[in-house]
Amino acid sequence: MSWLSSLYPIFIASTAFCALGLLLVAIILLSRKFLIKVHPCKLRINNDDSLTKTVDSGKTLLSSLLDSGIAIPSPCGGKAACKQCKIRITKNVDEPLETDRSTFSKQQLEQGWRLSCQTKVQHDMNLEIEERYFNASSWEGTVVSNENVATFIKELVLSVDPARPIPFKPGGYLQITVPSYKTNTSDWKQTMDPQYYSDWETFHLFDKVIDHQSLDANSANKAYSLASYPAELPLIKFNIRIATPPFINKSPDPTIPWGVCSSYIFSLKPGDKVTVSGPYGESFMKEDNRPVIFLIGGAGSSFGRSHILDLLLSKHTNRELTLWYGARSLKENIYQEEYEKLEKEFPNFHYHLVLSQPLQEDLDKGWDSKDPIKTNFLFKAFELGQLSKLPNPEDYLYYVCGPALHNSSILTLLDNYGVERSSIILDDFGS
């Protein structure tokens, strides 16, 4: 029993330490409740009294405007990564944050330009907002399906009211609003093909509880490119990749949270209701008859599909269209059958699939691991298979979308071949 007696002081100390920690947390929460007082603030917009909004203090300017029915685009979900939620404050401008300093010039900062996702509403302000943002609206969609199309990518299909279609253009995006929620990743198996289970099990991704029940209304939203084209309405489609924590010894780091928006989307089931707002976008098709090359990787498949199907099936274009799509293996490839069918039907459409890490099962099916145009990083395969053979690469349009490394590699490659930045349309949500 002596060894039990020796543990008694340790037990008492540990208990006291935990109790003290809980007490400090309670004090902090109570202090916030009673010391940080919420008060009404007026946001006067474009010097128009009829547009003045009264909001509670404490939230970001981005969230406050969204609560008031003005959806400023923020593709990165308010993380100051995409730098698209720019807004000009003309009265009562606070000191710029570091995120503002890295975004705007000194002159712009003096003029009151700020990132609305980082600016807290603490007092009355006068704002200048582009009129196009007043045309953005919200829609409620119903989940039709939410199946995995790759190990970590889902195709979310929503149906919206056909009497109120969304006026989007190919290359555009919508913001998905995330309510408070709680989910267990094991429940996601309901909308996942069993072929993807093994990778999730290898990285211990199942049976993880993700709890965001404390989310404020409209505090979380993220933009996703549309994979559908207008003729598919009232259905709209997205390709969405799950944002997992970084891995440590083949397990997600428990100290890093899962993506708030992507986890919510992965938890959706047929029949669920989803709120989207928009439409937004700048990466539309340039109507100048130049041939177009799409350089797409991963979940960038949304961006490519929307443009390509609209050009071929709705606009019946005669422009030469080439798609280079990069995936790790055939299991990760998206829309292959659809593109192969289009290639047979339209002589002006050319489809190239490039695998960076083909599986043994891919090789067993006849995939050529020795061909550098089929098995390679996409930017290298594209250079070997097409770019180096073009007499005038600058005469083409290049539409680029994919992971950050994919995008940067393509941009560097095109720059090396003398392609002007104005001929490159990059769909990049701050990745």
UniProtKB/Swiss-Prot annotation:
EC supergroup of this enzyme: translocase
| Binding, [2Fe-2S] cluster | 76, 82, 85, 117
Gene Ontology terms for molecular function: 2 iron, 2 sulfur cluster binding; electron transfer activity; metal ion binding; oxidoreductase activity, acting on NAD(P)H, quinone or similar compound as acceptor
Q: Name which cysteines form disulfide bonds.
A: none
What is any one of the record's Gene Ontology cellular component terms?
A: plasma membrane
Cofactor requirement: [2Fe-2S] cluster; FAD
Q: Write out the GO biological process terms.
A: sodium ion transport
Q: Recite the UniProt keywords alphabetically.
A: 2Fe-2S, Cell inner membrane, Cell membrane, FAD, Flavoprotein, Ion transport, Iron, Iron-sulfur, Membrane, Metal-binding, NAD, Sodium, Sodium transport, Translocase, Transmembrane, Transmembrane helix, Transport, Ubiquinone
Region described as Catalytic: spans on this chain: 289-413
Record protein name field: Na(+)-translocating NADH-quinone reductase subunit F
| Organism of derivation | Chlamydia muridarum (strain MoPn / Nigg)
